[in-house]
Structure formats: C-alpha cells, structure tokens
Design a protein with these regions (language model features):
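Bacterial c-di-GMP phosphodiesterase EAL domain
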Residues: 1-100, 112, 126-127, 147, ...
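EAL-family c-di-GMP phosphodiesterase catalytic domain
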Residues: 9-13, 26-27, 61, 78-85, ...
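Glycine-rich, phosphate-binding/catalytic loops in enzymes
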Residues: 37, 90-94, 123-126, 152-154, ...
Length: 236
C-alpha cells in the first residue's frame, strides 16, 4: 500500500493522505492500477480487496495515533462494497478490532460502477459519519459521479477529477468548471480537494479559485510508508 499526501492550501501543510494500492510484476515494475482493479471488479473481488485495504489502513492509523501523529487517512471504497447491506457494520467491527479512531478516517466513494441502491448507500454513509468518519466523493465530474450523488449522499468532501485540474492554468473551460464546482460545493457546506495537481501554475490557479486542498505529483507521488514525509508542505 502506498500513500499520497493531501495538503491544505490555507496552511500549506499536509492534513491527510490517501491510501493507494500498488502492485509489482515479476520484474519489479509497477502494474497500472486500472489493470488489476478492473480484473478485481469484473471477478467480484472488489469488496474483499476493499476490506483488506481498509483494515491495513486502520492499523497504520493506530500506529500514527500512538506516535502522536494527527494525519488523517483517506480510504477508497467502491460501489460494489458500499452496496453491501452490512458494510457499515463491518467497518465498525474493523474499528473495534484495530482500535482505530474513526475521526481520523475519510472514506472516498470511488465510481468504478454505479451504485445499485442510492438509498442504502445514504443510510450506510450516515452510519459511518455517526462513527465519526468523514465521506468524500471521488473523481467528481466524470464517470458515474453526478450531481445526484452530491444532492443525495451525505458527503463532506468533493474531489475534483484530475481531468479538470492538470491543465487548469492553460484551459479557460477547466477554470470555469472548477470555479463552478467550488462555488457549488462551498454553498452546500462541503470542502473541495483538487487531485492531479502537477505544477506550480495549476496550484496558484486553484488557490485563486478558493480550492481547499490539493493532491498531486507537484506535492508528492504516492510513496511507501517508509518514504512518506509526515511533515510534507507546499514546495517553496
């Protein structure tokens, strides 16, 4: 499992980081995540994979908690997992088993598939919030993520997909779209994370557009735990 910092633009400091799955082939080269995640999704293994990552992430959070580290962890959950009626119960069981602090956890709803039952998803996400966790809507603007999800689901964060972020300093249409998403999100009381920030130019535009947090290669690539700088800040 790898970790990618997410930095608060107001303080310039890392406030949380996202847990990301990475796999190597026999030659030690990285396998594109889409390749093995698509296989897991098509074979019905996504829930099992999600729960393995969730438990590992929670155990890492406990290590940080005992060391006095306040960094929050963002953990991806896919639609097939959230569609399970006992999802929130299983999360509570993992919390109890690991001793993790739910207040330090953010669950990111990843849209590899459309939700089968949005009412069930709303109920389960609210249960996670009752535990103390926060909810993020990932990849906003593409795929199955829609304004309906923003309206119907109890999310705390909106993550703008990198397709609208990487060249926001060059493309007027992207700036208009990002500005609209930020205004809508703030109007609904939600915070905004821009992912895919790969340049200083993009960072400065996003700051001017009142984005709350940024994530991307300009800050840090995903790294293993032993290479993660818990004092990551915005580059000078």
């Amino acid at each position: 499992m790898f970790f990618q910092p997410i930095v608060d633009l107001s303080s310039g400091k890392m406030t949380h980081c996202e847990c990301l799955i990475r796999m190597l082939d026999n030659d030690g080269n990285f396998i594109p995540p889409a390749s093995f995640l698509d296989i897991a999704n098509e074979s019905g293994l996504m829930p099992r994979l999600d729960y393995l990552v969730i438990e590992k992430a929670m155990r890492q959070q406990v290590v940080w908690q005992r060391a006095g580290v306040n960094t929050r962890l963002s953990i991806n959950i896919t639609a097939p997992t959230l569609d399970q009626p006992d999802f929130a119960q299983r999360i509570a069981e993992i919390v109890n088993r690991t001793g993790a602090d739910p207040r330090a956890l953010i669950f990111e709803l990843v849209e590899t598939d459309a939700l089968q039952d949005i009412d069930n998803a709303r109920r389960l996400l609210k249960q996670l919030q009752t535990l103390g966790a926060s909810i993020a809507l990932d990849d906003f603007g593409i795929g199955f993520t829609s304004f309906e999800y923003v309206r119907e689901l109890p999310v705390d964060y909106i993550k703008i997909d990198k397709a609208f972020v990487q060249f926001v300093h060059e493309r007027e249409n992207d700036r208009v779209l990002v500005r609209s998403i930020v205004e809508m999100s703030h109007g609904l009381g939600k915070r905004v994370i821009a992912e895919g920030v790969d340049s200083r130019q993009a960072l400065e535009v996003l700051r001017a557009l009142d984005v709350d947090y940024i994530q991307g290669y300009y800050i840090s690539r995903p790294v293993p735990i032993n290479a993660l700088n818990l004092r990551t800040t915005l580059p000078d």
